[in-house]
Design a protein with these regions (language model features):
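Conserved N-proximal alpha/beta basic substrate-recognition cap immediately N-terminal to
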Residues: 1-53
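A structural signal for short, well-ordered beta-strand segments and their strand-loop junctions
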Residues: 4-11, 58, 72, 103
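Proline-rich intrinsically disordered, low-complexity coils
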Residues: 7, 18, 55, 118-121, ...
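Generic detector of intrinsically disordered, low-complexity, polar/charged segments
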Residues: 15, 20, 24, 61-66, ...
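Phosphate-binding site of ATP-dependent enzymes
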Residues: 37-56, 63-68, 74-157
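Conserved catalytic alpha/beta cores of large enzymes that bind or transform nucleotide phosphates
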Residues: 150-179
Length: 179
């Protein structure tokens, strides 16, 4: 029996912009329009599913971020109004590589919490099988920001059999071990 599922439930909306130079303020109009385009799509999904959360997007380099050159925005106007400090941060990523193309990606609020801090799960797969994992945790960030930043740490991931039923937060365990 076949079934159908809205692809948005398992993927995110995104848009790409090329020929961007944050230092020279070139291409920011494309980024701003892309932000609005993605936000419009997200708002439609939120209305369809009754989600009462303000949508946001990540604007990030398309050449890998290493946790650098990422910003969270809630409107295209924010892109047109960014100050020089933020433009410089977005213009150059790790090892001085200039960011000339960006991805505008739907933001998904972090729902996992470890030690009262937002956390995102990371699973390690070998041959399609989960063999380990950890949570990226950052108590200096909120549920809408990139957790791969200063203050980030990893906490081992356990399966339910290792959890103490009375413990509300995720349990400490051996880093990376599952099952």
């Amino acid at each position: 029996t076949a079934f159908s599922i809205d692809p948005w439930l398992i993927t995110t909306e995104f848009h790409k912009c090329g020929r961007v130079n944050f230092g020279e303020k070139q291409g920011l109009e494309c980024v701003a329009m892309g932000v609005e385009k993605v936000l419009h799509k997200i708002r439609a999904h939120y209305a369809k599913y009754g989600i009462a959360h303000e949508p946001y997007v990540y604007v990030k380099s398309d050449s890998g971020t290493y946790g650098m050159g990422i910003m969270t925005v809630k409107s295209g106007d924010e892109m047109l109004e960014i100050n020089k400090k933020i433009r410089n941060k977005m213009n150059v990523i790790k090892e001085g590589v200039q960011s000339t193309e960006v991805i505008i990606q739907e933001g998904v609020p972090t729902v996992d919490v470890v030690d009262a801090a937002p956390a995102e799960p990371m699973l390690y797969l070998v041959d399609g099988h989960a063999v380990g994992g950890a949570y990226r945790v950052n108590d200096q960030r909120d549920a809408e920001n990139n957790l791969n930043a200063t203050g980030m740490r990893f906490v081992g991931m356990c399966d339910e059999s290792e959890a103490d039923a009375t413990h509300k937060a995720l349990p400490p365990c051996q880093f990376g071990a599952l099952g």
